[in-house]
Amino acid sequence: MGRTLENKQQIVTEIKSLLNDSEMAVVLDYKGLTIKEMSDLRSRLQTTNGICKVTKNSLMRKAIDGDSNWNDLESLLTGTNAFVLIKEDVGGAVKAIQSFQKDTKKSETKGALFEGRLLSNSEIKEIASLPSKEVLMAKIAGALNGVATKIAISINEVPSGLARSLKQHSEKPES
């Protein structure tokens, strides 16, 4: 028994909602993966706030229809696809996918869409090499803190230098 029209509409609505919350979509060919391996991929993605969704290409096509951010995804909608929808930690999720692919040697990345732009496999690998958002924020905070510390030391040094000069001048014997 096939899916009812109402059921298909619910799936399309769910996919649209997931896409609205996502920053990036990675399309994987999942042919040959077992249920256990798909569960493994899903659990790896949970820590990075990514979702692996297996759905028919026709339903994904309906979900992206008219959405300029996701329209280019249509060129990847052939064959057996699993869609990894990434909400926040894009680099971490791509690392999780690559780690999974390295371990299973079964799944292939067809492509990805990030901020309305199709990415090649080499660009996807570059994203994986980026540090996480938290690491970048820590680096920026450290750099800003260093600048603030130097400014505070410089500001404090002017009155201290003036005080030392006045003290030296007052202790100098009058000639």
UniProtKB/Swiss-Prot annotation:
It comes from the Bacteria. Transmembrane segments: none annotated. One of its GO terms (molecular function) is large ribosomal subunit rRNA binding. One of its GO terms (cellular component) is ribonucleoprotein complex. Keywords: Ribonucleoprotein, Ribosomal protein, RNA-binding, rRNA-binding. Pfam families: Ribosomal_L10 (PF00466). One of its GO terms (biological process) is translation. Part of the ribosomal stalk of the 50S ribosomal subunit. The N-terminus interacts with L11 and the large rRNA to form the base of the stalk. The C-terminus forms an elongated spine to which L12 dimers bind in a sequential fashion forming a multimeric L10(L12)X complex. Belongs to the universal ribosomal protein uL10 family. Forms part of the ribosomal stalk, playing a central role in the interaction of the ribosome with GTP-bound translation factors. This is Large ribosomal subunit protein uL10. It comes from Prochlorococcus marinus (strain MIT 9312).
